[in-house]
Amino acid sequence: MAKKSMIAKQKRTPKYNVQAYTRCERCGRPHSVLRKFKLCRICFRELAYKGQIPGVKKASW
């Protein structure tokens, strides 16, 4: 889990646009965030296995 101060800091609008970055909406992780779902890879995997993300299923070929 991310520190509360870092999550609050990220929600503010930055002085410069290049300073903006994505953060997981569920756990606050700043790295490996899928933009479409606003989740990190770990949270995405957990929710996908539980079937809580509509339209996502395990790949098989």
Curated annotation (Swiss-Prot):
Zinc recorded as keyword: yes
MF-aspect GO terms: rRNA binding; structural constituent of ribosome; zinc ion binding
Keyword annotations from UniProtKB, A to Z: Metal-binding, Ribonucleoprotein, Ribosomal protein, RNA-binding, rRNA-binding, Zinc
A Gene Ontology term for the protein's cellular component: small ribosomal subunit
Gene3D superfamilies cross-referenced by the UniProt entry: 30s Ribosomal Protein S14, Chain N (4.10.830.10)
Pfam families referenced in this protein's UniProt entry, alphabetically: Ribosomal_S14
GO biological processes: translation
Function description: Binds 16S rRNA, required for the assembly of 30S particles and may also be responsible for determining the conformation of the 16S rRNA at the A site.
Record family assignment: Belongs to the universal ribosomal protein uS14 family. Zinc-binding uS14 subfamily.
Protein name: Small ribosomal subunit protein uS14B
Lineage: Bacteria, Bacillati, Bacillota, Bacilli, Bacillales
The encoding gene: rpsZ
